[in-house]
Amino acid sequence: MSTQTILPVDRETVAALSSRKNEPAWLAEFRLQALEKAATLDYPKLEKTKIERWNLDSYGTHADAAEAKSFADVPAEARGFLNEDGAQDMDNVLVQHNSGVVYRRLNAELAAKGIIFTDLETAVREHEALVKPYLMQALKADEHRMAALHAALWNGGAFLYVPKNVEVDIPLQALFYTDNAQATFAPHVLIVAEANSRVSYMDNYVSGQLQAPIVHNGVVEVFVKPGAKVTYASIHHLGEQATDVTFRRAVVENDGRIEWIVGEMHNGNAASETNSILEGNGSTSDAKIICVGNGEQKLNITTKAVHVGKSSDSQMITRAVMRESASSIINGITKIEKGATKANGEQTERVLMLSPKARGDANPILLIDEDDVTAGHAASAGQVNQEQVFYMMSRGISREDAENLIIRGFLAPVVAEVPNEYLQQLLKSYIERKLGQ
């Protein structure tokens, strides 16, 4: 049973946050109620990981961000994560620096189609009718303590709305950047894609030189209406001082589709859940996730699909590389509810360990309450295949190069799916760095 707990923030701090942001009364009250719930809720229960032993108290305080008048005013280090020279002006981009969004720009052509792409704080005030029905609905504030604390403290974030029958040909992009461990960093991403719309969105979570521990408690909610398709690509590359906890949820209606492409490249402890709730008949999801661990890192990565609709289909691939003394728990969960006839769920989890001290655990889980369905899983955890290494060495390739080629090929199916060439190259550089190359 849960007991009353001392929280990292108090009621006065949360109330002051709402007041400073001039939030509507319903949101101010919602934040306070969430904080009260947090005091009595447990931390999320993760397979084979005691997250409560991690540093989960370093939230800091909200620090107002100075608005950037132009892209050149965005911190130089942050700009470098968006384009190669870090100077070129960019459309369809949003940048959060520590506790608030400092830059947002949507080109006139997309705005004329009714697309909204702005920070969530602004969206709450200017597009309340579009935000209120969805905020903290895919992930409820009373699910666990991390969800409740996020609901009480979220800041900045992104809101993307795509009207019915509108197709967006270019990906929209957000950067969430923290370099101050004393500033609360808890962005919330909310995407609503109306019927028969199409959109690609990608974001990058990065940190500068953090001088003290910090918690990133992030939530992503995606609502895919009938016949719509959303592609969501995300790379996390926070520093060793950061504890990264992220919950991603998509609710997919009839014939809708969600595609997840995720690179978990953290340097500190990290836990993430990427969950597709296939509510509609004919709804589909595809999740491709990679992670690389090194040092003393502890990672818990969960990919999940919940089938509610008939003839729904989920595909999940998770690949992890562990080196040095890193450890990972890789969970794949397919849940098929009663009544979800003709549903199909397939999942694969593979862990590659590069040192004797590295640890990896691949856990395929099938929870099936309906007879007329198909489901499958494959899982493996082990060292680099030495037969492959020897074969390449017999062709004149050194052992080190052979192992590197195998690792790159192992991760390639996800890297190749990132819908932006520069971000794809950035992900490759993160991988090379984490592998010590």
Q: What is each of the regions a protein language model found here?
A:
Residues S2-A148, I317-R323:
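N-terminal amphipathic, basic helical "cap/leader" segment at the start of enzyme domains
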Residues E109-I397, L411, V415-Q437:
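Conserved beta-strand/loop scaffold segments within soluble protein domains that form the structured core
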